[in-house]
Design a protein with these regions (language model features):
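Short beta-strand/loop motif that positions the catalytic acidic residue
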Residues: 113, 119-121, 125
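Alpha/beta-hydrolase-fold enzymes
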Residues: 1-86
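Short coil/turn segments at beta-strand junctions that form active-site/ligand-binding loops
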Residues: 115-116, 148
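Short alpha-helix in the alpha/beta-hydrolase fold that links the catalytic acid
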Residues: 129-139
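Acidic catalytic loop of the alpha/beta-hydrolase fold
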Residues: 124-128, 159-160
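Short, well-ordered loop/turn and helix-capping segments at boundaries between secondary-structure elements
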Residues: 92, 126, 139-142
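Catalytic histidine neighborhood in serine/cysteine hydrolases
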Residues: 87, 137-177
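Mobile cap/lid helix-loop segments that gate and shape the active-site cleft of serine hydrolases
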Residues: 72-108, 115
């Protein structure tokens, strides 16, 4: 919701990059899911690219069967016009957090969303930095802090593993806001 601090992903989202995407995708076309996946992998090249180059290509080893690898490879194509609007309005303009985004001529005001909210972030997330998720949690109004209001949980691990791995003693953990 709040893209004021995009983290390392910001290397791909600046005025020049967005203008290039607008020139090629704003009227039609697709942003290919495999291109997005490659972009996300390039943000953590040692873990998500070079590890496989060395082990698979150079050493001839087959990658182990690993559910996270399958999930990571399951990408989705995005409509070009939606993708460039997302980059421009949400990332560059941060319009949603500023209550400046409109849909069907209606201004979206996050403070009018008065529902219990559970916000999960992952400490090593390279796509959604946990500090951005924390800032996003405070863009919405909550009826009360407890018992139903806002619950922010910071999980150990990264973008995918931080979501699906359960907490485990001496291996994975999580923290909650008091």
């Amino acid at each position: 919701l709040d893209f004021s601090e995009p983290g390392i992903l910001g290397v791909y989202v600046d005025e020049q990059q967005v203008a290039l995407r607008e020139a090629t995708l704003s009227q039609a076309g697709l942003k290919l899911g495999r291109e997005l996946a490659s972009s996300f992998s390039s943000l953590r090249p040692n873990d998500l690219i070079w590890n496989y180059v060395v082990n698979n290509y150079l050493k001839g080893q087959s990658p182990p069967a690993f559910d996270l690898l399958y999930w990571n490879a399951d990408s989705t194509n995005l409509p070009g016009p939606m993708f460039v609007q997302y980059l421009r309005r949400l990332y560059l303009d941060n319009a949603l957090a500023k209550n400046e985004l409109e849909s069907l001529d209606v201004r979206l005001d996050l403070k009018k969303i008065n529902l219990p909210s559970y916000v999960l972030a992952a400490r090593e997330d390279h796509i959604v930095p946990w500090k951005s998720a924390y800032a996003s949690a405070h863009c919405i109004k909550t009826a009360s802090r407890k018992p139903a209001g806002l619950r922010f949980v910071l999980a150990a691990s990264g973008h995918i593993a931080g979501v699906i791995n359960p907490a485990h003693k001496n291996k994975r953990s999580f923290w909650t806001a008091a």
